[in-house]
């Protein structure tokens, strides 16, 4: 049977990568749409006395989905580590699809009152619950089918697939801006991309049904029960904590340059919606290019060199470039600054994903990776739009989101030093055998 055949043949490698990353595409497609259409969603579901209050409520609901990620990481991650990568990834896709359908179909506040924002919140919670293990499950799968010496390159396609989703979503949004008027988009047009997302769910189910189990999982003789999984996670809390800080840099930068960029460009820098979409498309293409490069370079010179080099560069340059952007904001400056941040994200994340799979205990690799990633996304990435909006409002400084990006870079630098010191001293290897 297909599900018991190890996914190791060269001929099937590309197909395996495509099938396993298809769910990543859907997840990021929906998340980007929520960020880009935040102002329209705010008016539809969260009417308030001021645009700022309405937008903050929307971003709070957006962030709530990330708070469910750690729960999904633990529950679904333990399930995947116990029963297999293939079956677990099918379950996450089903839950994600339910959340997507709910957001696309729920009527507005004017039609059903408080039930509208409540249902949107439920949809985001379902998406967050499934997404809590989606990245981890995909990353672990890719790391386990990778050929020797190419783990960084293979795992980089987890994030690269998300960039395709960003470009596709931005292209759809750009097309709608050209063909529909502002009023039409505000009233009903913003739902069209969400319906498109619903339409591709059956295709992704077909792709994932033919996914083969990894040889590494099939060869495991021991299948830990839930108690063993939780005990191992508790024993390795230091690795989980360091992993969370390691992910902070990538998740904060990513959600700033993709999800928050359209809102930042329109409401803070006063650029047009079309300009913001074009910049976002360019960022998606740039991310797609730099991610596999970062992963491949880390395979050659080591994860630590890439991670520390990029975090130091981010700490040195983030504030000056944000000041330069906001001094005279225009399309060219915004493009250059975000492409610079895209370089940070792609290179760092390309190395980081492989590093995180390598330091996690083998029997809880999915739940450990997913928990660290989910905590970082909930604390840092998911709250980036709300924190950035609040910083600009409270300080009156349009470049103030740069401080948040620098904070995340500092976390990444500290985590890299912490993990690789422990790795060099043999602590992590010993813990992984426990």
UniProtKB/Swiss-Prot annotation:
Q: Name one GO biological process term.
A: citrate metabolic process
SUPFAM superfamilies assigned to the protein according to its UniProt record, in alphabetical order: MFS general substrate transporter
State the annotated membrane topology for this chain.
Answer: Multi-pass membrane protein
> Known InterPro entries for this protein?
H+-coupled_symporters, MFS, MFS_dom, MFS_trans_sf, MHS_symport, Sugar_transporter_CS
Q: Which cysteines are joined by disulfide bonds?
A: none
Going by the entry's taxonomy, the superkingdom of the source organism is recorded as Bacteria
Return any one Pfam family short name: MFS_1
**What family classification does the UniProt entry report for this protein?**
Belongs to the major facilitator superfamily. Metabolite:H+ Symporter (MHS) family (TC 2.A.1.6) family.
Q: What is this protein called?
A: Citrate-proton symporter
Species in which this protein is naturally found: Salmonella typhi
Q: What is the lineage of its organism?
A: Bacteria, Pseudomonadati, Pseudomonadota, Gammaproteobacteria, Enterobacterales
């Amino acid at each position: 049977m297909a599900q018991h055949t190890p996914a190791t043949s060269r001929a099937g490698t590309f197909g395996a990568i495509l099938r396993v990353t298809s769910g990543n595409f859907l997840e990021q497609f929906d998340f980007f749409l929520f960020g880009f259409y935040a102002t329209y969603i705010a008016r539809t579901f969260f009417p308030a006395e001021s645009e700022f209050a309405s937008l903050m409520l929307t971003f709070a609901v957006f962030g709530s989905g990330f708070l469910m990620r750690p729960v999904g990481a633990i529950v679904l991650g333990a399930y995947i580590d116990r029963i297999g990568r293939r079956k677990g990834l099918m379950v996450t896709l089903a839950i994600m699809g339910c959340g997507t359908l709910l957001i696309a179909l729920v009527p507005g506040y004017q039609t059903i009152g408080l039930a509208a924002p409540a249902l949107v919140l439920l949809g985001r919670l379902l998406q967050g619950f499934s997404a809590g293990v989606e990245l981890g499950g995909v990353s672990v799968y890719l790391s386990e089918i990778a050929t020797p010496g190419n783990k960084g390159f293979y795992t980089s396609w987890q994030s690269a697939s998300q960039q395709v989703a960003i470009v596709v979503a931005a292209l759809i949004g750009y097309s709608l801006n050209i063909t529909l008027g502002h009023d039409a988009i505000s009233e009903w047009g913003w739902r069209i991309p969400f319906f498109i997302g619903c339409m591709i769910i059956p295709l992704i189910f077909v792709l994932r049904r033919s996914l083969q189990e990894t040889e590494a999982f099939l060869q495991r003789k021991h299948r830990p029960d839930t108690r063993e999984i939780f005990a191992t996670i508790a024993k390795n809390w230091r690795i989980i904590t360091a992993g969370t800080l390691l992910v902070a840099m990538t998740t904060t930068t990513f959600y700033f340059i993709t999800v928050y960029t359209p809102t930042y460009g329109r409401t803070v820098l006063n650029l047009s919606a079309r300009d913001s979409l074009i910049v976002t498309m360019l960022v998606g293409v740039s991310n797609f290019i730099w991610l596999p490069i970062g992963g491949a370079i880390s395979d050659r010179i080591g994860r630590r060199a890439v991670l520390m080099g990029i975090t130091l560069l981010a700490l040195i340059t983030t504030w000056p470039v944000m000041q330069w952007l906001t001094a005279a904001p225009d399309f060219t400056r915004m493009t250059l600054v975000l492409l610079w941040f895209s370089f940070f994200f792609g290179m760092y994340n390309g190395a980081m994903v492989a590093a995180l799979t390598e330091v996690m205990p083998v029997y809880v690799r999915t739940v450990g990776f997913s928990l660290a990633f989910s905590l970082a996304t909930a604390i840092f990435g998911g709250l980036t739009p709300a924190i950035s909006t609040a910083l600009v409002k409270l300080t009156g400084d349009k470049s103030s989101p740069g401080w948040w990006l620098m904070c995340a870079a500092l976390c990444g630098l500290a985590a890299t030093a912490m993990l690789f010191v422990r790795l060099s001293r043999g602590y992590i290897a010993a813990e992984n055998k426990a």
